[in-house]
Design a protein with these regions (language model features):
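Bacterial Sec-dependent N-terminal signal peptides
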Residues: 1-22
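Periplasmic peptidoglycan-binding/anchoring modules of Gram-negative envelope and division proteins
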Residues: 21-30, 37, 41-77, 105
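Extracytoplasmic
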Residues: 30-32, 69-71, 113, 182-184
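Short loop/turn segments at secondary-structure transitions that flank enzyme active sites
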Residues: 43, 82, 124, 193-195
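Residue-level recognition of well-ordered beta-strand positions that form the cores
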Residues: 77, 188-190
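Periplasmic OmpA-like peptidoglycan-binding domain that tethers envelope proteins to the cell wall
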Residues: 81-187
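Short, charged low-complexity linker/loop segments at the C-terminal edge of domains
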Residues: 192-204
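Amphipathic alpha-helical repeat scaffolds of TPR domains
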Residues: 206-213
């Protein structure tokens, strides 16, 4: 009898087979949330840029009412804009990282996660260049890009020339429109996400009644 059933299955076209449900666990990013800082500030300000929405997102992901059993790690990377001096910016980004660390302690989950990484990256010239390259309204954009690329080994000179370019027109624009995007901490929530993939089962013969979809 069993052999007859197997033979019947093998005789079905490929589209007639019931798909076998499978379960996989994938290490993946659940959410990436960005907290922005005002110029020279280190405290988390809910009124700064999109912080209100970011905090709501963190509440939904990390609060005690959330399903947090799959969350395995938190990665926090903090940055500053390049308008300050080198030593000042190093101190500033460390303080911002510490501020985020204190802010996250409101969530009980954070105290239970085994892997929490905090990293102070400092001046984010790579993102700065991307923002400059994509901003068609930036005065002297090509000259700004040339200065960024040419003076990679002399950051102090690069900053000095950016301030002086065209009597500071480009720099004043960047202070208003580019630098605020760089003053941030990026919080990446990592977890094991369970995925169950069930294809639709459409019976094509009487033997399909043997399966449970």
């Amino acid at each position: 009898f069993i052999l007859a059933i197997l033979m019947a299955l093998l005789s079905l076209p490929e589209s007639g087979y019931a798909a076998v449900p499978f379960f996989t666990v994938i290490n993946d990013t659940i959410r990436r949330v960005v907290i922005y800082f005002d110029a020279n500030e280190t405290n988390v300000n809910p009124c700064c840029k999109g912080n209100k929405e970011a905090i709501i997102a963190l509440d939904s992901l990390l609060s005690g009412n959330s399903d947090t059993k799959y969350i395995t790690a938190l990665n926090v990377v903090s940055f500053v804009s390049p308008d300050g001096g080198e030593s000042y910016n190093k101190s500033l980004v460390t303080k911002r990282n510490n501020s985020i660390k204190e802010f996250l302690r409101r969530y009980e989950l954070v105290n239970n996660v085994d892997k929490i990484h905090f990293c102070s990256k400092g001046e984010d010239w790579l993102e700065f260049r991307k923002l400059v390259a994509s901003d068609t309204n930036l005065p002297d954009r090509e000259e700004v890009l040339m200065l960024i690329d040419y003076h990679k080994d002399d950051i102090a000179k690069r900053k000095q020339l950016l301030r002086k370019l065209n009597r500071g027109a480009a720099y004043r624009y960047m202070v208003r429109n580019v630098f605020p995007e760089l003053r941030r901490s990026v919080i990446t929530i990592v977890g094991e996400t369970g995925i169950i993939d069930r294809e639709a089962f459409e019976p094509v013969s009487s033997v399909s009644g043997l399966f449970v979809s």
